[in-house]
Amino acid sequence: MATYAEMQQIFDDIRGDFRYDHDLNGCLNCGICTATCPSAQFYDYSPREIVQLLWTENVEQIYDAMQEKIWACAQCMTCAARCPFKNSPGGLVAIMREVAIKHEMQSAKDVLRPFGRVMLKLITTGNQLSPDMIQPDHFPDWGPNIQKVEGDLQVLRKAIPVKTLQTVETAWEVSLKTSVEMYTIWEMTGVLKSLELMDENLFDVIEDFIDEKREDYEDWLEEQEEEDDE
């Protein structure tokens, strides 16, 4: 259990985020956000509660909500679209999650641990979603026409063999230059630092992979320079 001073520091970090004042503007207590929230239908989670806790600056209850409740949010932002006061409970939850990671809260580690393998795959290989990865049966809300599109996909690809229309065979191919640029972005924005706080072992594996990719890129650049000189 954190001390009151630690809880206060956590709240100060939440409130100090540049997005905080934009996402929190008061509360009419109308309940529209919770009534339209998909997560509220299945979990002990209420967007209105998040707004009210932050608005009243109840640091102890805010800390308690960060143990489990904030991880139930689906980040669909329906709440932000519906709120008459222009609040963004989903945006506030995003801030709270980032602060939870920054403070190495156990709740963040518990939630993110199962995604270690996915994180490794995304960072080391790519993160594209190709059309033939999609299973229409899992998304009935897309309507019946999606079945027609999916059924003709392979035929359409033969008729229009555009390389940029990715499929599973090529969707995970990422150029060396793009990979190195992404690694730099993740470093500069603190993504890799957050990963290190959550799972040091996974971070070590990914860091070694990144170093190898950067060495490969440097070798490639040298080869290009030699070819240009010739």
Task: Cite the ranges covered by each PLM segment.
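Generic N-terminal helix/loop capping motif
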Residues: 30, 36, 40-43, 53-57, ...
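C-terminal, charged low-complexity interaction regions
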Residues: 149-230
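Juxtamembrane/interfacial segments around transmembrane helices
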Residues: 76-82, 119-131, 164-180
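Cysteine-centered iron-sulfur cluster-binding motifs in ferredoxin-type domains/subunits
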Residues: 21-40, 68-87
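Generic detector of bulky aromatic hydrophobic side chains
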Residues: 25, 53-56, 80, 219
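Ferredoxin-type iron-sulfur electron-transfer modules in oxidoreductases and energy-metabolism complexes
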Residues: 4-18, 42-70, 87-152
